[in-house]
């Protein structure tokens, strides 16, 4: 039996929590405190309007300070009570004929344990706008949409230790890939889309594949019923996401990654910083 089939069999039989090990302190490593952001470019495919669309995705990971009582970025962290977070932005611009889906999801994850403190999502195309916010201080999910369904909804959502699907590309980087084998988790379905809905919380099985994975990556399988995601993370720290085969049929493949103060790169020609394949 192949190593992949053996892993899938182990996933099916995995008891809760077995050998799912997280590395303490991932969010406090020195790389996140160098005053720069990690900006990664992915070649992306996404199912939209009955076709697979080709685009690029941008991931941004950067350390920030949130005002503790409000969960907004502190203008002056030195004079405010703050929470240190890793902010993960997932930015999309997906073409569909005449118009594009312009979308961005932000996860604000506490540096200790990478648990999200807040998640926001915006999506717009020529039909209208949608906005989502989840907050850990109220455990409330707020949806605002142009569409009748979902329309305007405020719903309770307490993760109770479940992982947000939309945060996995960041949170799974905190795994101890050498010690993790297989185990069961709970996953909160995606809210990233033009018609977001109150998500379901599903049982999931996770497993790490090392020996059969391509050189230089750890392969992580996540199964939720008949939905399967496969992530490939670089073996070297900080374990950037190299590839993601998603359960909806979409894919992300890493093309370029740099550390930079992107908020200062506003001059004509600065776009070339992301044009050269490779990692820096």
PLM feature segments, named:
Residues 8-17:
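Hydrophobic h-region of N-terminal signal peptides that target proteins for export
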Residues 12, 163-167, 235:
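General structural signal for secondary-structure boundaries
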